[in-house]
Each structure stands twice: as structure tokens, then as C-alpha cells.
């Protein structure tokens, strides 16, 4: 039965065997394009990051999150929502801009350890390897569409931001509500929630701890589905501490409540842990799950694929910015996190690429034709982000479509 479950495409991106211009490069290029067009993401088997480095990064993350709260709170940034976040002792996350650059990584270290800490080198090296992988993937994408001339300009117009995340292990008697795919983009990133379900299964109260990106604002409306095809309209009011340019940050939520008819079966299924479905705003992201799974991706057919962690594998996922750049050829997939493990702490790391401020995202003319008419107007990513924080942006089912879709009437 398990063999019939949908799975993401698995593509080998081994640095040792994949060389530009080789027959394998051409084959992988085609596979990457097909996977992204079909799913918006794929699982990649890599050798760029050794098991030893992965272990060192996990150890460094554990050391990082073990710091006293007052020390962690020194991870601040002039740019809004780019520092340390914690919510009710349930989750924590750090954001590091340009984590792949040693000097920038050291600046992050100085915030937490004025005397310095050598472990940051492992995180920087990890980010550097993932950045190299990301650039290779984006090169493969552009080549597959015959726009090689655009590669250098594109790669030089982006930067990286890393997010390090920790999900605190929950007790066995903790009841949680799964959050479905019908989520207002105002709360358009990963969230984990606790739910209290009445004996009659008719009423729930949800506290949402959101592991999100730069796209979340503090007074948002969220449609939370508890069970199958059941939505709950929930007003979220809280303090925001999400990164301005990172898709896997965190959000402090003040209060969330709602009512829904929840069957016992659905309540049991969703009592594991739910994180709202969302699309990333980035160009691309590379996600690594350390040992404990949780990531799920929604297919075009509406099925959820649960991605199991495996040695030397990562998830490559397209964001809204890439969707716009590629004129909608590559979708930005909905995905969520459901942590079902109990008494185990989950660590995850993600590296996201973003357009630099002032760079205009505009689909190359080769991607616009009769079969694929222009889907999005040119825009600056910063303007998209600012629109997201307006009333119209928060309410739109698709921030990208509402902001720059050719049918948006703007």
C-alpha cells in the first residue's frame, strides 16, 4: 500500500558526476525542469554536504539554541523581522543573512558570542555548499528553457538568507490541530498549532506558532482546516518577528480562536501537529530535515506527499518569485509541516535565495508566447513584500496574482 503513495521525484545532483555539457547534465537538466513544472519541487540526492558536516551543523545548532535567552535575543538586525524568535517555549529560530559568506557569518557570531565561536564556521560552510547547489539548480532551470544568456545576470541579482529552526518536543498528551491548505496568504507560511477539542468534537481553540517566512504580518486572517474539507475562519492578532526576507522564520501569535464541526476520526488524524499550508515568496529554497520528518508537499491533484528524511538528501522548492520570473511555467507549491514524533526535538535548516532590492523581476521574452501569454507584470520584490503587508495583500488568495498578475487590473 505504501508503494502506491505519491512521492516527489528524486534527482541525483552529485557534484562528482554532474558536469556542465555532459550527457548526464543534459539528462538531469530535463529531469529538473519536468519535476519543477509538475510539482514545483523535488528531492535531491547530493554529495556536496558530507555526513560529517551535517553532524557538525546539528551540533552547532544544538549549541546555538542552548544559549541563555538573553544571549539569543542579541540576534537582532536593522531590517525588520530578521532576528531571533521564540514563542511560548514551543519553537525557536534564527535568521542569518548572507550566511554563505564567512564575514557575514562572523557578524552573526559576534551578536551571540562577543568572544567568538568556531562552530559558526560549520554553519557558514554548510550554507556555502547549499548556495553552490542552488546556483547549479537555477543554472539548469534557465538552460532548460534556452535562456543561457540570462544566467549570469540572474545569479548576480540574488542573495541568500538561512533560517535555523528548532521545534521543541511535545508531551504525549498534547493535542494538536492540523492546518489545511485553505490559508489566507496573510499567514502564508509554516505554523504549528495546539488545539483543545470539546468532547462533542464541535469546538476548537487554536494557538498558532508559525514557522514562517518574511511574508507574515501581525493582524492576519487565517482559514484553518481541521479534519477533511473543514475550514475555520480565524483572526490572528499578535506580535510579528518574522524575517523580512526568509521563508522559514517564526511568528509570535497573540491569540487565535475558532469554531468548527470536527469529527472524531478527523480530530484523531489531525491531533498530531499541523502547520498551515503555504507557498514561499523566495526564488528558491533548499530545505534539510535533520532526522525528524514533518515536511509535506501538495500535488496538483490535491494529494499530500510526506517527505521522509534520508541521508544526503534535501528538498529543492520553487517560490513565488521564481514562478513570476518563469512566467508561471514553474509553480510555487503549497507545503506544510506536520510533526508526528513525540518526545523528540526537531531541527531543520533552510537556505533561501531572494532578488536583491531594486532588481526588477521580468519574464524573459523567450518564456512569453501564444501558448504562454504574459502572466505577471514586471515588479521589484520589495514592492511585492510591501504590498503583502497592505489590507489588500493580506486578504488576497494569491499575493503574487493580486499584486502583479496581468488580470489583477493594476
Curated annotation (Swiss-Prot):
Coiled coil: none annotated. Residues 258-355 form the Fe2OG dioxygenase domain. One of its GO terms (molecular function) is 2-oxoglutarate-dependent dioxygenase activity. Its EC number is 1.14.11.-. GO terms for biological process: glucosinolate biosynthetic process. 2-oxoglutarate binds at residue 346. Keywords: Dioxygenase, Iron, Metal-binding, Oxidoreductase. Fe cation binds at residues 278, 280, 335. Its cofactor is Fe(2+). Binds 1 Fe(2+) ion per subunit. The keyword Metal-binding applies. PROSITE patterns: FE2OG_OXY. It is an enzyme of class 1 (oxidoreductase). Pfam families: 2OG-FeII_Oxy (PF03171), DIOX_N (PF14226). Signal peptide: none annotated. InterPro entries: DIOX_N, IPNS-like_FE2OG_OXY, IPNS-like_sf, Iron_ascorbate_oxido_reductase, Oxoglu/Fe-dep_dioxygenase_dom. Belongs to the iron/ascorbate-dependent oxidoreductase family. 2-oxoglutarate-dependent dioxygenase involved in glucosinolates biosynthesis. Catalyzes the conversion of methylsulfinylalkyl glucosinolates to hydroxyalkyl glucosinolates. This is 2-oxoglutarate-dependent dioxygenase AOP3.
Amino acid at each position: 500500500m505504501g508503494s502506491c503513495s505519491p512521492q516527489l521525484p528524486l534527482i541525483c545532483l552529485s557534484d562528482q558526476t554532474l558536469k556542465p555539457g555532459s550527457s548526464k547534465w543534459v539528462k538531469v537538466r530535463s529531469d529538473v525542469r519536468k519535476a519543477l513544472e509538475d510539482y514545483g519541487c523535488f528531492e535531491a540526492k547530493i554529495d556536496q554536504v558530507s555526513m560529517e558536516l551535517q553532524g557538525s551543523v546539528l551540533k552547532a545548532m544544538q549549541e546555538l539554541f542552548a544559549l541563555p535567552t538573553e544571549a539569543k535575543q542579541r540576534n537582532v538586525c536593522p531590517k525588520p523581522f530578521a532576528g531571533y524568535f521564540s514563542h511560548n517555549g514551543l519553537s525557536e529560530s534564527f535568521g542569518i543573512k548572507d550566511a554563505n559568506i564567512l564575514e557575514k557569518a562572523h557578524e552573526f557570531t559576534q551578536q551571540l558570542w562577543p568572544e567568538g565561536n568556531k562552530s559558526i564556521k560549520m554553519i557558514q560552510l554548510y550554507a556555502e555548499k547549499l548556495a553552490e547547489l542552488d546556483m547549479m539548480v537555477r543554472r539548469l532551470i534557465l538552460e532548460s528553457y534556452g535562456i543561457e544568456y540570462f544566467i549570469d545576470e540572474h545569479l548576480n541579482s540574488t542573495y541568500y538568507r538561512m533560517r535555523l529552526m528548532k521545534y521543541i518536543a511535545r508531551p504525549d498528551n498534547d493535542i494538536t490541530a492540523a492546518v489545511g491548505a485553505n490559508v489566507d496568504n496573510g499567514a502564508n507560511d509554516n505554523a504549528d498549532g495546539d488545539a483543545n477539542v470539546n468532547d462533542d468534537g464541535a469546538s476548537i481553540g487554536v494557538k498558532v506558532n508559525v514557522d514562517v517566512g518574511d511574508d507574515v504580518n501581525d493582524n492576519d486572517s487565517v482559514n484553518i482546516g481541521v479534519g477533511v474539507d473543514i475550514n475555520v475562519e480565524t483572526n490572528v492578532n499578535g506580535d510579528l518577528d518574522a524575517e523580512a526576507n526568509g521563508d522559514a522564520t517564526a511568528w509570535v501569535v497573540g491569540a487565535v480562536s475558532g469554531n468548527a464541526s470536527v469529527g472524531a476520526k478527523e480530530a484523531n488524524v489531525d491531533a498530531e501537529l499541523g502547520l498551515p499550508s503555504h507557498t514561499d515568496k523566495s526564488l528558491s529554497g533548499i530545505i534539510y530535515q535533520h532526522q525528524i520528518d514533518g515536511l509535506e508537499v501538495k500535488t496538483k491533484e490535491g494529494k499530500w506527499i510526506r517527505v521522509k528524511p534520508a541521508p544526503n538528501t534535501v528538498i529543492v522548492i520553487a517560490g513565488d518569485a521564481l514562478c513570476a520570473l518563469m512566467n508561471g511555467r514553474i509553480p510555487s507549491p503549497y507545503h506544510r509541516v506536520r510533526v508526528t514524533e513525540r518526545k523528540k526535538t526537531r531541527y531543520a535548516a533552510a537556505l533561501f535565495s531572494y532578488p536583491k532590492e531594486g532588481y526588477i523581476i521580468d519574464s524573459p521574452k523567450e518564456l512569453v508566447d501564444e501558448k504562454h501569454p504574459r502572466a505577471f507584470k514586471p515588479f521589484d520584490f520589495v514592492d511585492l513584500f510591501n504590498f503583502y503587508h497592505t489590507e489588500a495583500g493580506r486578504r488576497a488568495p494569491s499575493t503574487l496574482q493580486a499584486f502583479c498578475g496581468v488580470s489583477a487590473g493594476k
